[in-house]
């Protein structure tokens, strides 16, 4: 089995203060997948105050994709990351950082460091295409999450 790694990044703006955005993003609930437009199940095991294991089964067309992720939280710096322990991008790491933009807005800086496994060495064009598709998928999910966050936080006021 060959392994190749690559990275991708994007930013997502929130019309929510940074601390509130961080707290909303890291409160991990069983219905989070539906907020991203996905159908599936999320199990949450809190190991410590700053460490969780997420177990997800997501239906994509005719198949179910299972993932198990280790999540580490860093609330002081408004950062967190997850490492995929099981799933299609096993051993991949995803970094999240909420940055303030004034007092009433913030921005997520997302970095995906993915590991791609294949039987043969993948051509660089194929690796770039996979990274492009993953970036597109993740960025779209965060657009949906941003809308849900802004709607939910606005109703709390």
Q: Where do the model's predicted regions map?
A:
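Glycine-rich portal/gate segments that line the openings of hydrophobic small-molecule binding cavities
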Residues: 29-33, 42-86, 140-157
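Hydrophobic/aromatic beta-strand elements that line small-molecule binding cavities or substrate pockets
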Residues: 10-12, 42, 65-72, 92-100, ...
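Hydrophobic ligand-binding cavity/cleft-lining segments
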Residues: 1-51
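Beta-strand elements of well-folded, non-transmembrane domains
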Residues: 14-18, 58-62, 74, 86, ...
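Beta-strand/loop substructures that line and gate deep hydrophobic ligand-binding cavities in soluble
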Residues: 83-140
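Residue-level preference for beta-strand/loop junctions
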Residues: 4-6, 62, 90
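Short amphipathic alpha-helical segments
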Residues: 17-20, 24, 133, 137-141, ...
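Intrinsic-disorder/low-complexity, polar/charged segments enriched in Ser/Thr/Lys/Arg/Asp/Glu/Gln
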Residues: 5-13, 51, 77, 93, ...
């Amino acid at each position: 089995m060959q392994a190749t790694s690559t990275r991708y990044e994007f930013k997502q703006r929130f019309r929510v203060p940074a601390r509130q955005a961080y707290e909303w993003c890291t409160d991990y609930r069983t219905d989070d997948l539906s907020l991203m437009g996905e159908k599936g199940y999320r199990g949450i095991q809190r190991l410590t105050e700053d460490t969780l294991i997420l177990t997800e089964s997501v239906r994509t067309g005719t198949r179910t994709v299972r993932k198990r992720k280790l999540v580490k939280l860093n609330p002081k710096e408004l950062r967190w990351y997850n490492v995929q322990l099981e799933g299609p991008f096993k051993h991949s790491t995803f970094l999240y950082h909420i940055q303030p933009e004034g007092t009433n807005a913030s921005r997520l800086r997302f970095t995906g460091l993915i590991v791609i496994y294949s039987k043969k060495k993948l051509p660089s064009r194929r690796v770039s295409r996979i990274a492009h598709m993953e970036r597109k998928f993740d960025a779209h999910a965060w657009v949906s999450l941003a809308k849900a966050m802004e709607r939910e936080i606005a109703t709390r006021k």
